């Protein structure tokens, strides 16, 4: 995202929203969706102890995120890594982890 006033690059989340062609998406919407999903997950556990919830939630969010970003960049790993704010080597490891290489 480019700030026209200061002529500098600004990370979208620093201004509290993500800009899209159709307008702004507030990160709070994503947070709320994850919160609902995790709440539903625990409700379905029926008193059983859950294990490795952190890793499960991260992978359930990360895999579709990577898939969408790779589609958006038409497989360009350099662009995808830049969009995600990670280096290309890290992206390649994550793609391999989810069988997307």
From Swiss-Prot:
Protein name: DNA-binding protein Fis
Gene Ontology molecular-function annotations: DNA-binding transcription factor activity; sequence-specific DNA binding
Subunit structure: Homodimer.
Gene3D superfamilies: Homeodomain-like
Lineage: Bacteria, Pseudomonadati, Pseudomonadota, Gammaproteobacteria, Alteromonadales
Function (record text): Activates ribosomal RNA transcription. Plays a direct role in upstream activation of rRNA promoters.
Keywords: Activator, DNA-binding, Transcription, Transcription regulation
Family per similarity comment: Belongs to the transcriptional regulatory Fis family.
Residue ranges the UniProt entry marks as DNA-binding: 77-96
Phosphoprotein among keywords: no
